[in-house]
């Protein structure tokens, strides 16, 4: 689960981190009032969406007058912002931040942290190249990224933060400020089950103070049950509608950009199914794992979610019956096809528990379903059907 910038800043501020002050506005009148509250001379206005690249997409603007504020608010609020991190539809802009103008600054740094699966530790990253996409820095000048792995038994140590501060070229009081910021960030990360944390830029102002100008926070969704305050910050309008619907039925669904819908039981088999579709020249439209304990109702809903994607031109159902019986899956497929007006080819591959009975039910249903005898056969048939 992602947080908006204003939510992330409010959370980090609770841990004593210095953040750029800003006021949330949902319309032009509120934006003007916020502008005046901040002095009425200069302010930075930022669209609140769960995506990076807002500046290049027109989602950030410096306002020097009320007219600038009104124009930006009216043009951006209740529209959709398309950035390099969104799909073609973009993300809905329901609000903006009117923030204090902290420029000019002396330097812009970067500070971030992730859960590194290879080291199985929280890993901090810092760079002197703040204010730009960190992915670009990592690709072009990886030597400019400083990494620190944190031992979970002892936590982040002050000496580690000081070493990063020295590497960033900070001096005197700035070192102490940075140590406090990095330690507070680690505390916030652990206590709120962050999956991702990013301050870009972390600005060094002309008076020497260090300030978090932007904040990006992602929360581990599996931990939300124990984080009621954080869970209440969830903005469902920023999430894919199909993924949101899938979560209500405990379905693991991720929307992709292809045209072949996939329904599989088991994450590994789902990945293999997408791979073999690509191998035969197709493009998967989604990842969908109905799980080992799939019920008839969940399978029907999964079918509906797949077909709700208008780009889907064919569906591959790949079920290996273990805990899930293939005859139950077959009954669910028949019910779903009868309930939903299916106009695209559907290829079904059933193996394992009651596979023969499942295949018999499908054959006797009278529906136009394409049977497959193996994974390769299924992929070849669905790709051919889509291209026909």
Curated annotation (Swiss-Prot):
<dbReference type="GO" id="GO:0004775">
    <property type="term" value="F:succinate-CoA ligase (ADP-forming) activity"/>
</dbReference>
<keyword id="KW-0460">Magnesium</keyword>
<dbReference type="InterPro" id="IPR017866">
    <property type="entry name" value="Succ-CoA_synthase_bsu_CS"/>
</dbReference>
<comment type="function">
    <text>Succinyl-CoA synthetase functions in the citric acid cycle (TCA), coupling the hydrolysis of succinyl-CoA to the synthesis of either ATP or GTP and thus represents the only step of substrate-level phosphorylation in the TCA. The beta subunit provides nucleotide specificity of the enzyme and binds the substrate succinate, while the binding sites for coenzyme A and phosphate are found in the alpha subunit.</text>
</comment>
<dbReference type="InterPro" id="IPR005809">
    <property type="entry name" value="Succ_CoA_ligase-like_bsu"/>
</dbReference>
<feature type="binding site">
    <location>
        <position position="108"/>
    </location>
    <ligand>
        <name>ATP</name>
    </ligand>
</feature>
<dbReference type="GO" id="GO:0006104">
    <property type="term" value="P:succinyl-CoA metabolic process"/>
</dbReference>
<dbReference type="InterPro" id="IPR013815">
    <property type="entry name" value="ATP_grasp_subdomain_1"/>
</dbReference>
<comment type="similarity">
    <text>Belongs to the succinate/malate CoA ligase beta subunit family.</text>
</comment>
<dbReference type="GO" id="GO:0042709">
    <property type="term" value="C:succinate-CoA ligase complex"/>
</dbReference>
<protein>
    <recommendedName>
        <fullName>Succinate--CoA ligase [ADP-forming] subunit beta</fullName>
        <ecNumber>6.2.1.5</ecNumber>
    </recommendedName>
</protein>
<feature type="binding site">
    <location>
        <begin position="322"/>
        <end position="324"/>
    </location>
    <ligand>
        <name>substrate</name>
    </ligand>
</feature>
<feature type="domain" description="ATP-grasp">
    <location>
        <begin position="9"/>
        <end position="245"/>
    </location>
</feature>
<dbReference type="GO" id="GO:0004776">
    <property type="term" value="F:succinate-CoA ligase (GDP-forming) activity"/>
</dbReference>
<comment type="pathway">
    <text>Carbohydrate metabolism; tricarboxylic acid cycle; succinate from succinyl-CoA (ligase route): step 1/1.</text>
</comment>
<keyword id="KW-0479">Metal-binding</keyword>
<feature type="binding site">
    <location>
        <position position="200"/>
    </location>
    <ligand>
        <name>Mg(2+)</name>
    </ligand>
</feature>
<feature type="binding site">
    <location>
        <position position="103"/>
    </location>
    <ligand>
        <name>ATP</name>
    </ligand>
</feature>
<feature type="binding site">
    <location>
        <position position="46"/>
    </location>
    <ligand>
        <name>ATP</name>
    </ligand>
</feature>
<keyword id="KW-0436">Ligase</keyword>
<dbReference type="GO" id="GO:0005524">
    <property type="term" value="F:ATP binding"/>
</dbReference>
<feature type="binding site">
    <location>
        <position position="100"/>
    </location>
    <ligand>
        <name>ATP</name>
    </ligand>
</feature>
<feature type="binding site">
    <location>
        <position position="214"/>
    </location>
    <ligand>
        <name>Mg(2+)</name>
    </ligand>
</feature>
<dbReference type="InterPro" id="IPR011761">
    <property type="entry name" value="ATP-grasp"/>
</dbReference>
<dbReference type="InterPro" id="IPR005811">
    <property type="entry name" value="SUCC_ACL_C"/>
</dbReference>
<keyword id="KW-0547">Nucleotide-binding</keyword>
<dbReference type="GO" id="GO:0000287">
    <property type="term" value="F:magnesium ion binding"/>
</dbReference>
<dbReference type="GO" id="GO:0005829">
    <property type="term" value="C:cytosol"/>
</dbReference>
<dbReference type="InterPro" id="IPR013650">
    <property type="entry name" value="ATP-grasp_succ-CoA_synth-type"/>
</dbReference>
<dbReference type="Pfam" id="PF00549">
    <property type="entry name" value="Ligase_CoA"/>
</dbReference>
<comment type="subunit">
    <text>Heterotetramer of two alpha and two beta subunits.</text>
</comment>
<dbReference type="InterPro" id="IPR016102">
    <property type="entry name" value="Succinyl-CoA_synth-like"/>
</dbReference>
<feature type="binding site">
    <location>
        <position position="265"/>
    </location>
    <ligand>
        <name>substrate</name>
    </ligand>
</feature>
<feature type="binding site">
    <location>
        <begin position="53"/>
        <end position="55"/>
    </location>
    <ligand>
        <name>ATP</name>
    </ligand>
</feature>
<dbReference type="GO" id="GO:0006099">
    <property type="term" value="P:tricarboxylic acid cycle"/>
</dbReference>
<dbReference type="Pfam" id="PF08442">
    <property type="entry name" value="ATP-grasp_2"/>
</dbReference>
<keyword id="KW-0067">ATP-binding</keyword>
<keyword id="KW-0816">Tricarboxylic acid cycle</keyword>
